[in-house]
Amino acid sequence: TAASLQLSMLGGSGHIEGTNKNGRLSYLIGARHKTSKYLFNAMDTKADYTPKFSDLQAFINYELNTDWQISFLGNISKNEYTMIPENRDTDFGTINEALKLRIYFEGQEVDKYETYFGALSTTYQPSTELNLQFTTSAFQTFEQENFDILGEYWLYQLENNLGSDEFGDVAFDRGVGKYINHARNSLNARVLNFSHKGNYNKEAIKVDWGFRMQKEEIEDKISEWNLIDSAFFNFPHPVDSIGNPTSNPNQQIVMSELLKTQINLSSYRNSGYMQVSK
């Protein structure tokens, strides 16, 4: 039996492996956890970044007898990303027309990604001429992307006179506005698989065969929209109406971008082969 453990400011990892007394059972299990919070904090946008990554892997093999063995391979992975933005400053333009964009944020983004995988395989060799293998596996992935981000931005003209004591500072405002980014996206996919392989080799004849059956199910939903408004021009407001100041017909908020999709996909795949050689 052997084991290891590593720890750091960004996470840690560990594993254990070994066999039982008679050597029939062997195993290898490992786990990891990592956060990149310190790395993301160096980005231009000032925000509270909290990314987390965790996974667990395992491989177990057991020999029932000299002719028959069973093995299992599994993996679990969970990733989570949370961002709460605060503000951002961006300088751009030329020396003759230097600009600064300052944005103050409200809201947050929360993304989750989960993956599960498991495979069970058995190998049976009743004789030196015949070898049989059966494998069944399952795969599941789930993803979520959710965010509501409100940004209030100011566009500044910077002082471009090289001889001025205020060179590079804000000279005046060129415009203000707001924007909203919204998303509720999800993906759910499942894959089930069963396969068989075999070969028979005796004297001058060799036969190989196999087949595979697989089922796939995918559910994909996307719901995103983006609204950009300058001085609330896109928001509903009372219209001018001489003689009837209370007139206010129905008005709509016009989105800058809108995307809504939903896909449900189910498929079956079957395949097989046989080869005879001398």
Task: Specify the residue positions occupied by each region the protein language model found.
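Transmembrane beta-barrel wall of Gram-negative outer-membrane proteins
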Residues: 8-33, 46-85, 110-132
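Short, highly charged low-complexity linear segments
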Residues: 32, 92-97, 135-143
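Face-selective signature of the C-terminal outer-membrane beta-barrel domain
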Residues: 63, 67-78, 108-278
